[in-house]
Curated annotation (Swiss-Prot):
Its main location: membrane. This is Fluoride-specific ion channel FluC. GO terms for cellular component: plasma membrane. GO terms for molecular function: fluoride channel activity; fluoride transmembrane transporter activity; metal ion binding. It catalyses: fluoride(in) = fluoride(out). Keywords: Cell inner membrane, Cell membrane, Ion channel, Ion transport, Membrane, Metal-binding, Sodium, Transmembrane, Transmembrane helix, Transport.
């Protein structure tokens, strides 16, 4: 268990640092008025987690610690949006459109409400 946690931690560190560097570079040098850096990181994270899970299903990358490093660690540190999208993709693959709609709707609606509540709490 400790070894797995270390792999996740190393992946999270790597993904988080890379997210910061990419996002900062894009925002500073390309377009400071639109959150293009975050959008780029989220889209790249979705591509990465799709690539990794595709390789897992083919039988490649079967080492459990490497899987944890890449998915929970790297992709989780890079962007949680990739995990969110992968979970939605799994619901689509399972033909579970009710839970897909519920998950997307609640994530966006409740997430925005909670952001607003948190902001309002300290803004007063």
């Amino acid at each position: 268990m400790l070894k797995t946690l270390l792999f996740i931690g190393m992946g999270s560190f790597t993904g988080g640092v890379l997210r910061y560097l990419i996002s900062r570079y894009v925002q500073n040098f390309l377009t400071p008025s639109f959150p293009l850096g975050t959008l780029l990181v989220n889209v790249l994270g979705c591509f990465a987690i799709g690539l990794f899970y595709g390789l897992f299903e083919r039988g490649n990358l079967m080492n459990p610690n490497l899987r944890m490093f890449l998915t929970v660690g790297f992709c989780g540190g890079f962007t949680t949006f990739s995990t969110f999208m992968n979970e939605n993709f799994q619901l689509i693959k399972d033909d579970n459109f009710f839970y897909l709609s519920l998950y997307v709707g609640l994530s966006l609606f409740v997430g925005f409400i909670m952001l607003y509540l948190g902001y309002s709490l300290v803004k007063q």
